[in-house]
């Protein structure tokens, strides 16, 4: 039984790691914080938008939250950076920062706003989001609580609103949204699919341990093939990845204006993987099942952001499935579902799934037989 004399166990009730053991040793915070700032381009805005800014600007942004840039890939639409803690994507009109561990992502907000100001843009949309932390007591200010995060964000965006998606004592997301989109406006057709996965298949996680850092090349290609990550990031994508020492793995991929990013924490007691993409789809189930095929998690959460003019948004408005519904995942049981509409047609859907008991039992038997 939990006691008030055991504060970490009490805090763990709100965390995302099940069965917290205070004697388990060092753990890494896999679930990421995510900040997206979208810029309204006006007549005075630099013709290249945020691409007019050099790498030194982004090094400063990343440094402000206690991370570093490790590698970069780019095309006409996206500059992609793999960080020591996750990823940064810079597009002409937006910045997406995704950071794990105990990084202080909100410390980067004034630096991001300076970047928007430097190219004479206007802030149109801001979202800050994170899955509930696995080890919330390890976080640093301003991330010690949702209240502190909200208070920090409200300093910069007074009209922004906070939301919680999912049960507070289990898998949930904190989301803050500042919306200054002038409607009616041009077509809104953005999409975002994000997945967080826990209790990864141990036959897979063994591949993400190493006695040294390994950058993009033949060795990381072999890791992708052995783990079937090459099914997610096939040859149509330009990619850069990093195998960490002693463990962990990150990959960014870009294709035109589309991106994917995957981050993996393989330790048994806190195994975790995340996946995110903005790739358009009429149904997300094929992509989600491909990712699940790599990690075979015990449980996962999926959250999708759907604009009204996107392919999937038009289907949703007609009452059709978008691929996050339970019928597409027979090995898993739907735990709960949360839906919110921020603006006309702009929908967020969040689902929690757990592997069915009979599937878990079969997997355990198969492992023993092997």
UniProtKB/Swiss-Prot annotation:
Pathway: Amine and polyamine biosynthesis; S-adenosylmethioninamine biosynthesis; S-adenosylmethioninamine from S-adenosyl-L-methionine: step 1/1. The active site is at residues 29, 32, 86, 100, 250, 263. Substrate binds at residues 28, 85, 267. Binds 1 pyruvoyl group covalently per subunit. InterPro entries: AdoMetDC-like, S-AdoMet_decarboxylase_euk, S-AdoMet_deCO2ase_core, S-AdoMet_deCO2ase_CS. GO terms for molecular function: adenosylmethionine decarboxylase activity. The modification Pyruvic acid (Ser) is found at residue 86. The keyword Lyase applies. Its EC number is 4.1.1.50. It catalyses: S-adenosyl-L-methionine + H(+) = S-adenosyl 3-(methylsulfanyl)propylamine + CO2. The record marks 85-86 as: Cleavage (non-hydrolytic). Belongs to the eukaryotic AdoMetDC family. This is S-adenosylmethionine decarboxylase proenzyme. It comes from Trypanosoma cruzi.
